Amino acid sequence: HEDALIVPEQPDKYNILTDDPSDPTQHFIYQFYQKYQTVIITNPTEADYKFNFTANNGIKITAPEQKQEIIDEGIEFLQKVLLNLYSDSFLKKNLPFSILLSEEVRMASYGETTIMNCYASSSFIALGNVSSSLETMTDEEFVKIRADVNASFWAKYMSEVRGLFTISDAFYEASEEVEPKLYDPNWYRFKGTDPNEIDFYKYGVITYSENSYIDEDWPDFNSIYAPLKSEDLAQWMNFVFEKTPAEIQEICDKYPVMKKKYDVIREAMLENGFDLSKLEL
């Protein structure tokens, strides 16, 4: 990979050149590197992630507990949550230099710390949640994390880092045809105070803006705002990986504006060799 930044100090720092067929995880890591030239790092240190080219990227990664069963489960989790969704040719073309298995990925920004399911930079993707709690993760939690990881992969890595995935204005124009002021810089406020009673799909959006004011005890004072363009796209990216194609089809049949926006995302992904409508979740 041309953007590979971290050159191992010793010939096989990450133990990727040694095959051990009796150890399924080591065998997988070895084969994965042979096939994709991508290093799976199971015990990341600061040197593996601290700097993104020359800028400090502001993240702190906690390596997984180095117990065999946790690393084994982490590899399985990586496959289920990301790798299995894509074809070999797509992965060969689009994986970064390394994938970091992490117990926790924290991002510090403006004095606030966010725990992330996934972080993408020019040379690596860090996957969080690799811990003993994988054993007790519910299906519902898994679906949400998988959606978030893939949304992050496309929005951050494929779009921001590599510039390969771009969404045309038609995406936002579809919603503006329904409500011209939806993305008003002064905030478009939905009529109604109960978010459960607002038909967001009618506007082509998934839900309300995180800048909304919602108090369950005093619903009359609620202010429910439409998402900003950036929020709208981020919510959609999670949505297309959280719902099955059949569920999305049903929603698109009922709401033409949802179909228009889904098609814009699908077309942009098709240009990168991935067919969202054939996604198997």
Description of each model-found segment:
Residues 168-240:
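Post-HExxH zinc-binding segment in Zn-dependent metallohydrolases
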Residues 209-281:
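A cross-kingdom marker for long, charged
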Residues 1-88, 251-281:
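Acidic/polar, low-complexity intrinsically disordered N-terminal segments immediately downstream
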Residues 104-149:
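Active-site scaffold of zinc-dependent metalloenzymes
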Residues 68-123:
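Auxiliary, metal-adjacent structural segments of Zn-dependent hydrolase domains
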Residues 100, 125-128, 234-235:
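Structural recognition of the beta-strand scaffold that forms the well-ordered cores
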Residues 140-172:
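Catalytic Zn2+-binding segment of zinc metalloproteases
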Residues 72-80, 147-152, 203, 235-238, ...:
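Solvent-exposed, polar/charged alpha-helical surfaces in well-ordered, non-transmembrane soluble domains
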